[in-house]
Curated annotation (Swiss-Prot):
Pathway: Lipid metabolism; phospholipid metabolism. It catalyses: an acyl phosphate + sn-glycerol 3-phosphate = a 1-acyl-sn-glycero-3-phosphate + phosphate. It comes from Sinorhizobium fredii (strain NBRC 101917 / NGR234). This is Glycerol-3-phosphate acyltransferase. One of its GO terms (molecular function) is acyl-phosphate glycerol-3-phosphate acyltransferase activity.
Amino acid sequence: MDLFSWQLGLPATLLCLAFGYLLGSIPFGLILTRMAGLGDVRKIGSGNIGATNVLRTGNKKLAAATLLLDALKGTAAAAIASLWGVEAGIAAGLAAFLGHLFPVWLSFKGGKGVATYIGVLLGLAPLMVPAFAAIWLAAAKITRYSSLSALIATAVMPIALYATGYGKVALLFALMTVITWIKHRANIQRLLSGTESRIGEKG
């Protein structure tokens, strides 16, 4: 079945994986907070290096910069590799996502991946980014849970991609969605117990 075929050669696949992983593993949240004199972001809040935890430092601009850079590293990996074909973009995009989640420089303890997920989406299927944003915003308005909004948007995205003809890219995002949900398992437990912080609340 063509959907599951892989034509990119092994050397090229490995090169794309290495390229994507190196880009994705750059811990912008940690770098920016240290440069700003705010210390180690891993020692506050959730201990995460992503934008949500950077926001807990009280520096909104730094959190926004972290969000943007974490997304753009996924975009850069996927878009640049895609110059050699969609499979190259898929390999690099997946590796960038995994690099953010499991950076070798931080003992494989990284972020939860939503920003990089969006970045890879921008690199491989840019027309779907507004759909992701609309789903997230609608869910956030209704539930006021950032984590639940992300879980809903990531769950819908592989289906939307497949329905609009993205094929292999849809399979990539199905895999990334499963990983995203696993990385959010603590959030899911708090949502089920009613202890998850809502948007605008501290915690």
